[in-house]
């Protein structure tokens, strides 16, 4: 993975910057880049449809342009990208950074987790609305083809999710060039419309948007629901910071994506000013009829790429949440050795597929899906703005007035969009919100239950001296082997080691008590990844440090000890891990009974520790324990 700090040193003539910028077009800008397929059409529909007047057209496109400027260009590109957690971006990385360095952790964590949960909620809609809006171009080609739109969209989505386990590293190399061609195409089509009606360029003046917003009462307010669709993919600009760095993301945005989007929206507005019908997708009406089918194919490919970015982002965010202790262990499969971000999480993939297909079939068209789309993303952006304000004031040391003025502008814009999108709640907006609440509850329950178990285990801590005294008094036999006892918490002597000695009356002459420590930073320096101290009598205490973007692999880590001259044979190690059986009594302790029951269910279905840490099955002993909560 390229370091952000190194990328910042690149200049415009550096081929690495150009390569990374091209790649960023394929990963970062897929969602926001395909928004022209449905945004302007939705805005005009919310404004009353039919034949809109000049003020409506100019005001609508002006609002879209300035939303792209304020939210995408200023908030995310100019500010958010500068606040990274050791090179990583996104709301979970920002939450971890702030909670690590500041007080008021419960508030920061609550805001960050809710923002992350909301991303999952709207992430189920993005593939559905994107693919449907692309395939709906067939209706312009021939009205009789409208009956094939839904089956084709469903087939594409099923195929997309089905191939995830195989990895997308090979075809992923084409994402950047394809999206570059996509942006060039929509930019040229838009410019063609602008040339036909250059008056539309006046919409760059924000006065048109403000006049329309404040002079049309409820209509001006409701239209913000449609306007917001142009930036639903803006959160990806920040979330993918660690993959590319600030410079390539900015270069791709200002060099191609942003001007192409502006021209396309202006071109669609120009077309409607010329009297084009708003009954069909305005985006496709920019294209000459001879090139309509190739454009539909290109649009479909672009929306598939946008959907792939959403799926990959969900995998990455899930891994972050697991490493930070907010979700149970899930099976993570590395699908390519070429990139750390090439992973697959089956549970997440099939959850997204079922939810996306359900929404696609249930709503049936991009127009109806737009009624449910945006509410969760607008709430996520509010959460990000709250954390940005804290970062500006506490990390950048800006005074509270300056921080408030900058964040206040973003807050006003974000709150306006969120308030407008709340009107979608009954029409389908409740779906992503409900999903977000479920996921947030899962994260809260898992973390709460995990802390409860940790407290109970800590109460039974045994010191090294007392343990050594006991094995000497009881005449425990030491055998020439190496044993590794894994524990998730720092303990002098973990319960599984005590149990092993009591039951077997034998102990290996080399014992490593390995504590897995998940850090609140994305990556741990290789020199700091493994720390080991000998406590005497052949017992070592070791700490394995992993960042929230890293996948633990214990055998590989222990090879470092062998390479450093420690007297251990990696092929002759026996791993001891605890297998807790959690049960609930009708006694109230730190968790309500129903929360406890849900935690027990999640715990039983979590991936076994041996699988998660890549331990060789033939060398693992699981020691069962019952824990009451």
Curated annotation (Swiss-Prot):
InterPro entries: K+_transporter, K_trans_C, K_trans_N, Kup. Keywords: Cell inner membrane, Cell membrane, Ion transport, Membrane, Potassium, Potassium transport, Symport, Transmembrane, Transmembrane helix, Transport. GO terms for cellular component: plasma membrane. It comes from the Bacteria. It is found in: Cell inner membrane. It catalyses: K(+)(in) + H(+)(in) = K(+)(out) + H(+)(out). Signal peptide: none annotated. It is a multi-pass membrane protein. Transport of potassium into the cell. Likely operates as a K(+):H(+) symporter. Belongs to the HAK/KUP transporter (TC 2.A.72) family. This is Probable potassium transport system protein Kup 3. It comes from Legionella pneumophila (strain Lens). The gene is kup3.
């Amino acid at each position: 993975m390229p370091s952000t700090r190194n990328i910042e040193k690149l200049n415009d003539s550096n081929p690495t910057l150009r390569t990374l910028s091209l790649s960023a077009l394929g990963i970062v800008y897929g969602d926001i880049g395909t928004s022209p397929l449905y945004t302007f059409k939705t805005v005009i529909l919310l404004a009353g449809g039919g034949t809109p007047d000049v003020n409506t057209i100019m005001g609508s496109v002006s609002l879209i342009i300035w939303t792209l400027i304020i939210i995408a260009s200023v908030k995310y590109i100019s500010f958010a990208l500068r606040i990274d957690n050791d090179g990583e971006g996104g709301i979970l990385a920002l939450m971890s950074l702030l909670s690590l360095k500041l007080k008021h952790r419960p508030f920061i964590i609550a805001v960050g987790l809710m923002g992350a949960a909301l991303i999952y909620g709207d992430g189920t809609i993005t593939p559905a609305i994107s693919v449907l809006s692309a395939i709906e171009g067939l209706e312009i080609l021939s009205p009789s083809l409208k009956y094939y739109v839904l089956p084709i969209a469903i087939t594409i989505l099923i195929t997309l999710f089905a191939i995830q386990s195989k990895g997308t590293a090979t075809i992923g190399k084409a994402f950047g060039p394809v999206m570059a061609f996509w942006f060039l195409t929509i930019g040229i089509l838009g410019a063609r419309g602008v040339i036909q009606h250059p008056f539309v360029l006046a919409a760059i003046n924000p006065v048109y948007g403000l006049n329309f917003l404040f002079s049309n009462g409820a209509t001006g307010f409701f239209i913000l629901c449609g306007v917001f669709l142009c930036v639903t993919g803006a959160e990806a600009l920040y979330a993918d910071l660690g993959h590319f760095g600030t410079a390539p993301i900015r270069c791709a945005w200002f060099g191609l994506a942003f001007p192409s989007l502006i021209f396309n929206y202006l071109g669609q507005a120009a077309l409607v000013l010329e009297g084009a019908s708003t009954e069909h997708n305005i985006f496709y009406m920019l294209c000459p009829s001879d090139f309509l089918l190739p454009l539909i194919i290109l649009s479909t490919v672009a929306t598939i790429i946008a959907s792939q970015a959403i799926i990959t982002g969900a995998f990455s965010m899930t891994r972050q949440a697991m490493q930070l202790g907010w979700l149970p262990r899930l099976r993570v499969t590395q699908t390519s050795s070429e990139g750390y971000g090439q992973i697959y999480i089956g549970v997440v993939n099939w959850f997204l597929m079922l939810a996306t297909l359900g929404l696609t079939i249930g709503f049936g068209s991009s127009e109806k899906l737009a009624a449910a789309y945006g509410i969760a993303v607008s709430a996520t952006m509010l959460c990000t703005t709250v954390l940005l304000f804290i970062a500006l004031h506490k990390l950048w040391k800006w005074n509270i007035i300056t921080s408030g003025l900058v964040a206040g502008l973003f807050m006003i814009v974000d709150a306006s969009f969120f308030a407008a999108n709340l009107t979608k709640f009954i029409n389908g907006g409740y779906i992503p919100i409900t999903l977000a609440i479920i996921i947030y509850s899962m994260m809260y329950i898992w973390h709460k239950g995990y802390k409860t178990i940790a407290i109970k285990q800590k109460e039974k801590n045994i010191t090294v001296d007392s343990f050594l005294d006991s094995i000497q008094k009881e005449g425990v036999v030491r055998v020439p082997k190496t044993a590794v006892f894994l524990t998730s918490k720092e303990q002098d002597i973990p319960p599984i080691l005590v149990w092993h000695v009591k039951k077997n009356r034998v102990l290996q002459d080399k014992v490593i008590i390995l504590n897995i420590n998940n850090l609140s930073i994305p990556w741990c320096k290789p020199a700091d990844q493994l720390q080991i101290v000998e406590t005497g009598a052949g017992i070592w205490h070791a700490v394995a440090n992993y960042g929230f973007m890293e996948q633990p692999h214990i055998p590989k880590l222990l090879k470092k000890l062998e390479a450093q001259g420690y007297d251990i044979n990696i092929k002759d190690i026996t791993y001891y891990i605890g297998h807790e059986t959690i049960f609930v009594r009708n006694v109230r302790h730190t968790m309500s009974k129903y929360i406890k029951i849900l935690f027990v269910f999640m715990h039983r279905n979590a991936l076994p520790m041996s699988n998660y840490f890549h331990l060789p099955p033939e060398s693992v002993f699981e020691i069962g324990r019952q824990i009451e909560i």
